[in-house]
Every structure is written in C-alpha cells, then in structure tokens.
Amino acid sequence: MASRFPKFSQGLAQDPTTRRIWFGIATAHDFESHDDITEERLYHKIFASHFGQLAIIFLWTSGNLFHVAWQGNFEAWVRDPLHVRPIAHAIWDPHFGQPAIEAFTRGGAPGPVNIAYSGVYQWWYTIGLRTNEDLYAGALFLLFLSVIFLIAGRLHLQPKWRPSVSWFKNAESRLNHHLSGLFGVSSLAWTGHLVHVAIPESRGVHVRWDNFLDELPHPQGLEPFFTGQWNLYAQNPDSSSHLFGTSQGAGTAILTLLGGFHPQTQSLWLTDMAHHHLAIAFVFSIAGHMYRTNFGIGHSMEDILEAHVPPGGLLGRGHKGLYNTINNSLHFQLGLALASLGVITSLVAQHMYSLPAYAFIAQDFTTQAALYTHHQYIAGFIMTGAFAHGAIFLIRDYNPEQNKDNVLARMLEHKEAIISHLSWVSLLLGFHTLGLYVHNDVMLAFGTPEKQILIEPIFAQWIQSAHGKTLYGFDILLSSTSGPAFDAGKSIWLPGWLNAINDNNNSLFSTIGPGDFLVHHAIALGLHTTTLILVKGALDARGSRLMPDKKDFGYSFPCDGPGRGGTCDISAWDAFYLAVFWMLNTIGWVTFYWHWKHITLWQGNVAQFNESSTYLMGWSRDYLWLNSSQLINGYNPFGMNSLSVWAWMFLFGHLVWATGFMFLISWRGYWQELIETLAWAHERTPLANLVRWRDKPVALSIVQARLVGLAHFSVGYIFTYAAFLIASTSGKFG
C-alpha cells in the first residue's frame, strides 16, 4: 500500500477512490501539507526546485537558439531584416498534401516552416550575433549551464551541501547579494557586452574571442575613465544617416544620452542602452552594500521596519512586527515577489512597443502585437497569484499576537471600508462607461452620430504635452517652445526625445481622443473589479461576517451546504477563481484596444479607430468581425493558405473555451450519476469487463471541477485570441 501514489500522503494513498489521483496531483506542490515535512525540508525542496526551474529555462532558450541555427534563416535575415521573414523552425507533418506544403514553404526555406513572431531574431541581431555558428555556440553554452544547474539542484539536497534554515532566513545577506550580485554585476556585465561586442558589431566591426583584446571599444581606451574625462565617451555618436551593421555614418561614442530612436532601425540607440545599464549597475552595486551582515556596518532591516511608526501614534504601530512576520512566511514573500514581477511584466509589455530596444522590431508588426499580448496575459496570471498567496499567508502564517495594531492588523480591521470603496468605484466606472457606450450606440443606430457624447481626455493629453507632444497646443513644459526645459532638451539631454514624441509613425505617446477615453474607463472598470474580488478574497480569508471561522477550513474549502447560511463562493480560493475570469476579461479589453489602435496606425487609417471605437457596435463590427475575416477564410474553395493553421486554431480555441462551461455550469451530482451509469455498463459489457481498475470512480470535487473549467476557459480564451491576433496582423502586413 505504501508504494501507491502519492508517497507524500499516506491518507491519500489509502483512499479507495479516484480522488487519490486527483487530490494527489493537486497537492503535489503543497509541500507544507505533506506527511513528513519539517521547516528545514520545506526550504530545501523549494531551494532545489529553483535550480530545476533555471535548468528548464536555460534548456528552453538553448532550444530556441539551436532550432533557429539548424532550421531557420538567420543569416539571410541579417542581410535584409525588413524583407526576409524570420523562420522559427521547420514543420514535419505526414498529413501535409501538396497544397499545405506550398502554403507553408516560406522565407526561402526548402520545405514547410513556422514564421517566428517572438522577436528573437531582432534581439540576437541587436546584441551582436550574426552567424549560425554564433547561435550554435550560444545553444551549447546554455545547454551546459542547464546541466550544471540540474547537478547543483541535486547537490543541494545532499546532507553535506544543504544550507541551514538560518541561511535561508538571513534576509540582509540575501538582499545584498541580489542587489549587488544579481542586478549590479549582471547589469555591469551586460554593459560590457554591449560596449565590447554589440556596439562595434552595429558599426561593422566584428568582435569575437579571437580579437576581443585587440579591438578597442573606444579609440582612447580607458584613458578618459582614469583621467575623469568621462564626457569623451559620449562625443561623436552615430549620425542620423548611420546604416546599422555597417561603418557608414557610424561614430565612436559608447555611452550617450541621445534619446529617441535610430532613424533606420526605429529602435533605441545602443549607446543610450549601454549608458542606462551602466547607471543601473552603479546604483544597484551601491544598494547591495546597505544592509548589515558580517562586519556590523550598514542598516538592520528589522531596525528600519521597527522605526516606521506613524507620528503621534494615531495610525497604529506602523511596521512593528513585520520583519519576523515576513521573514518567517514563504507565502508572504512569494506574494510580494509575484506582485512585483506581475507589475514589471506588464510594464515590459508597455515599454517593448513604445520604446523598442531591438533593431527593426518596430517594423515587424505581428511580432510587436504578439509580444504585447503575451506579456500582458503573463502579467495577469502572475498578479492574481500574488493575491492567492497573500490569502494563504493570512490563513496559515498570520499571527495576530505578533502583529497587534500594525499595518497588517489595521488592514484587517478596516477591511469593510476597503472593500466597500472598491465596490462603489467599480459600480461607478461600470455604469457610467457602459451608459456612455450604449448612448452612443443608440445615436448611431438612429442615424444621429452627431448626438454622441464624446469626451476629450484632456488630463491625459496635458500629461502627454508636458512630456513634449505639441499636437494638442497646450504649450506646457516640454511642449512649450519658449521654455528653458525645451531649449535644454535640444542640446543637453535627450535631444532625440522631442523628435520621437512628435513623430506620428511610432507608438510613443500615441495621439488620443474620445475612443481612448472610453476604453480607458472600461479597462479601469476591469482592473478595479478584479482588484475588488482579489482583495476581498484575501482580507476575508480567515473569516467574514457570514462565516467567522474560515481559518480552520483552509484556503480552498467548497460549499458547506445551506445549514451554515450557504458557504458557496466564499473561500479564498473561490475569490481567486472568480478574479481570474475578470482578469482575462480585462486583458481582453486591453489587448483589443492596443491591437485595433495599432493596426489602424500601421495601415495609415487612424480615423477608423477614432470614429468606430466610441460605441460597442463599432468594436464588434469594425474590430472583431472585420479582422476575423481572414480566419474564417482559412479554408475556401481555392484550397488552403498560410493562415489555415490559424483558422484551425481559432476554431480549436473556441472548442476548448466552450468545453470549460461543461465543468463550470454543471454540478457534482450530475457527474457522479453519469459515472455510476458508465461504470455499471462497463462491468456488464463482454470484453470491456475484462479490464478492471483499482480505484472506484468518483466525480471531481466542486473545487476541482471549477479548476478544470477555469483551465479550459483560460487556455481556450488565449488560444482563440492568439490565432485572431497573429492571423489578422500577418494577413495584413505579411
């Protein structure tokens, strides 16, 4: 019996039903709930799994490099980045007939291939890779790293190599090493790579290990550094006529503050980026020496937190008790990390298109759309996860005695005020935004478009103007041509910024109007409602007015029937589950908005977005319906085309999404009855009844079925939009 799955739970291993399998999978990573877990073993397992995670990441990136080198067209693309379509990898499919082979043979390939919409070609090109040999070398190096990390993970589970629990709880040392080592040193190393390899390569100078020590990155070498004449490194930058990858129009500067974009590649200046990373390295290297470790110098984090008490004591005891609460709760730490990472991932989405860092990526429209959408969805999942682990912290790790009257306790004490404020904000945003949209729809339907309510986003336009956008005529700060900031901007700092912000062909501070105002508030509704559900789920995780004793029921309890006044949908897990639907909904609006605004910008018909985005029928007809025509046309009487695979994925995505409802809208009794019937029929059918199973089949629990439904809903939703996005964009722009 002991050898049955799951080994970590004897209780589950002895369960006679199929619950053993599903609960086993569900709790496999909930180390805290395992039979023989100790605090030390918990930390060791998590530590080892981090090495495994990194090994998988290195293996994955190695695979990208390897497949492009083997089956891609990187060298051909490097010769003509704007006209050669980058190949991700070859497709081998025995079902392909001649029409399919012809449809998918692209980019100068000998057979069917997938086009890369990930931006890796532009990335590798920008950082100085030029040949397939470079890609193979990178792939082998990352494969080697992957193996090293797998060995390291295994090694740190051995008795001699296991760190102690006190090592894991040494917050000051960890923070110092992460700030100086992870951010500081790696940023410095990246500056070095940009200065020694990428910038010379962009100027036609090929630097590799054989000539690395002979080619000076700057004509004067290190002399300006040691003599304090650092401004020499910024003199003679690349000219506006510079051809990327050649010496034509190239300068000698390595650390600049030009601002704006390289005219040919439409990406940030490499020398600006090197300068940026050097500054980051400097700041973080200093930051990593702030906290007290071996030598008794520097700050104690506990002292800092204990000192954070509001003046007069009227707002409680501030941060007292927080240090030990956070340092002893892995869920709290994970919640903080996920919240930070989620926000950063969303910022990456916003900045990758508005300030493109990679050469020629701004002209690869499908890649721009794919990367924006990808990073926003990832951000959504990570951010909801932050609240999930915040709720688990409150259930498992929060000790009221340790946190009397501090910020945590006060959050819990006035949770009703927080929740009700989020509620009225959501209601206000929702009803007003929908009201405006519906009013405009009715006006269009009755043929009086001039009676629409169209509100100019004057505050947002003012902010854009303050940053230098002159279109709106606000004449303020950087857009005021007579002001000192404007004059300084032309020479002292970022002279290219003002040109970039007033160039209507890029995505930097796009021109905005009433359609943007409305969709902004629709997105604000989605964000506030998602936040409301997540915050309420976390703050009510230990107990609520209806059910004061939730703590003992744990994180994911299901309905407890009508006897307790009905406890459906009030566990912290239920709140997370509901919030994910709202998160997907919100990111749907975000990506619809971004994509529609950009395809009209790229096609040169911004009037379509401006005129049609002010009413709901405009969104349905001129964005969704109009752009799905390529997908619906994937198969037609003339055979197939290169969009057929996306047409199929569009259909398949809808199927997966719709399957989710089968789990979401039917309850346990239905499934249990169906299973009993099928099992009965199976046992009485000749031949079929030769196959028996050990576990009695039972229906999934309510919580499990909701998870399965949510997973199908999410995956189907994203699959469907991915197919729509890639097909509609690549169908227009190739």
Curated annotation (Swiss-Prot):
One annotated GO molecular function: oxidoreductase activity
Enzyme Commission number: 1.97.1.12
Membrane topology summary: Multi-pass membrane protein
SUPFAM superfamilies from the UniProt entry: Photosystem I subunits PsaA/PsaB
Keywords: 4Fe-4S, Chlorophyll, Chloroplast, Chromophore, Electron transport, Iron, Iron-sulfur, Magnesium, Membrane, Metal-binding, Oxidoreductase, Photosynthesis, Photosystem I, Plastid, Thylakoid, Transmembrane, Transmembrane helix, Transport
PROSITE patterns for the chain: PHOTOSYSTEM_I_PSAAB
Reaction(s) catalysed (UniProt annotation): reduced [plastocyanin] + hnu + oxidized [2Fe-2S]-[ferredoxin] = oxidized [plastocyanin] + reduced [2Fe-2S]-[ferredoxin]
GO cellular component, one term: chloroplast thylakoid membrane
Segments passing through the bilayer: 46-69, 135-158, 175-199, 273-291, 330-353, 369-395, 417-439, 517-535, 575-596, 643-665, 707-727
Cofactor remark from the record: P700 is a chlorophyll a/chlorophyll a' dimer, A0 is one or more chlorophyll a, A1 is one or both phylloquinones and FX is a shared 4Fe-4S iron-sulfur center.
Primary localization: plastid
One GO term (biological process): photosynthesis
Residues binding chlorophyll a B3: 662, 670
Binding-site residues for [4Fe-4S] cluster, renumbered to this chain: 559, 568
Binding residue positions for chlorophyll a B1: 654
Residues annotated to bind phylloquinone: 671
Annotated PANTHER family: OUTER MEMBRANE PROTEIN, OMPA-RELATED (PTHR30128), PHOTOSYSTEM I P700 CHLOROPHYLL A APOPROTEIN A1-RELATED (PTHR30128:SF19)
Quaternary context: The PsaA/B heterodimer binds the P700 chlorophyll special pair and subsequent electron acceptors. PSI consists of a core antenna complex that captures photons, and an electron transfer chain that converts photonic excitation into a charge separation. The eukaryotic PSI reaction center is composed of at least 11 subunits.
NCBIfam families given in the database record: psaB
Function: PsaA and PsaB bind P700, the primary electron donor of photosystem I (PSI), as well as the electron acceptors A0, A1 and FX. PSI is a plastocyanin-ferredoxin oxidoreductase, converting photonic excitation into a charge separation, which transfers an electron from the donor P700 chlorophyll pair to the spectroscopically characterized acceptors A0, A1, FX, FA and FB in turn. Oxidized P700 is reduced on the lumenal side of the thylakoid membrane by plastocyanin.
Name of the protein this chain belongs to: Photosystem I P700 chlorophyll a apoprotein A2
Primary gene name: psaB
